[in-house]
Regions:
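Acidic, divalent-metal-coordinating active-site segment for phosphoryl/phosphodiester hydrolysis
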Residues: 176-188
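Short glycine-rich anion-binding loops that position phosphate/pyrophosphate groups of nucleotides
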Residues: 138-140
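Glycine-rich beta-strand-to-loop/alpha-helix junction loops that act as flexible
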Residues: 173-176, 194-197
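Catalytic cores of soluble, metal-dependent hydrolases
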Residues: 184, 193, 200-202
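Conserved N-terminal beta1-alpha1 strand-loop-helix module at the mouth
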Residues: 1-87, 91-95, 102-110, 122-130, ...
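Generic enzyme active-site microenvironment
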Residues: 32, 172-173
C-alpha cells in the first residue's frame, strides 16, 4: 500500500481553499492536519474551527494529528469538526487505551504517534487497538525539518510488530519526507507518507504526489 497524506501545515494559509481543491484533484489519499497547542509542542497551528472549514472543502479523508496535551478531552470536538482519522501521541496520554476506545466509539479510525526517540517496543500491549501508528521522522512542532535517518530502522521494527500482533495496522511516517526517501520508506514497510514542503514547495504539487506513489 502506498498512500500519500499531504500536510496542510505547508500549504498557503492565505489560499487554503485553493490548495485543498488542488489536492482534491490530485492522486493524494488523505489530507494531513496538524493540531498544535503550544504546550506539547512549541508551535500553535490549527484548531477545531479551521478543521471544520477544511472539511467543508475536502473530498479526501481528514487525517488529524493531535500534537496536544491531554488529547482525550478533545476527541468529540474533532469528530464534530470532521476528522476521519485521529492520531494521538503516546507521550501525551496517561490512559492511551481509553483515548483509543473513545476515538473508535466516535466512529473514527484511531492511531498512536511516536516521537523520534520513543521506542517502538512500548506499543507491544496497545498495537492491537491501533488502526495506524504514525512515526515522527523529525521532532514535532515545525515543518521543513531534516529527516532523521534512524526512521528506516523504526519502520522495520514496527512492521515486524504489526505482522506479529495486528497485520491490519497501517504505518505512517511524518517529517522530512521527499522524493528521495519516499521509495526507501515504502520499501522498509511504510504504508502512508505525510509530505509537506516536498509537495507544496514543488513546481507541480500534483505531479510530485504522483511520483511519490510510484
Amino acid at each position: 500500500m502506498k498512500l500519500i497524506s499531504p500536510s496542510l501545515l505547508s500549504a498557503d494559509f492565505g489560499n487554503l481553499q485553493r490548495d485543498i481543491e488542488m489536492l482534491n484533484a490530485s492522486e493524494c489519499d488523505w489530507l494531513h492536519v496538524d493540531v498544535m497547542d503550544g504546550l506539547f509542542v512549541p508551535n500553535i497551528s490549527f484548531g477545531q474551527p479551521i478543521v471544520k472549514h477544511i472539511k467543508r472543502h475536502a473530498k479526501k479523508p481528514l487525517d488529524v494529528h493531535l500534537m496536544i496535551m491531554d488529547p482525550g478531552r478533545y476527541v468529540e470536538d474533532f469528530k464534530n469538526a470532521g476528522a476521519d482519522i485521529l492520531t494521538v501521541h503516546y507521550e501525551a496520554c496517561t490512559h492511551l487505551d481509553r483515548v483509543l476506545h473513545s476515538i473508535h466509539d466516535h466512529g473514527m479510525k484511531g492511531g498512536v504517534v511516536l516521537n523520534p526517540h520513543t521506542a517502538v517496543c512500548l506499543l507491544e500491549d496497545i498495537i492491537q487497538e491501533c488502526d495506524l501508528v504514525l512515526l515522527m521522522s523529525v521532532n514535532p512542532g515545525f515543518g521543513g525539518q531534516k529527516f532523521i535517518e534512524n526512521t528506516y530502522c523504526k519502520v522495520r521494527q514496527l512492521k515486524e510488530l504489526c505482522l506479529r500482533k495486528n497485520p491490519e495496522c497501517l504505518i505512517e511516517v511524518d517529517g522530512g519526507v521527499n522524493l528521495q526517501n519516499a521509495p526507501l520508506l515504502f520499501e522498509a514497510g511504510a504504508d502512508v507518507l505525510v509530505a509537506g514542503n516536498a509537495v507544496f514547495k514543488s513546481d507541480d504539487p500534483a505531479a510530485t504526489i504522483h511520483q511519490m506513489k510510484q
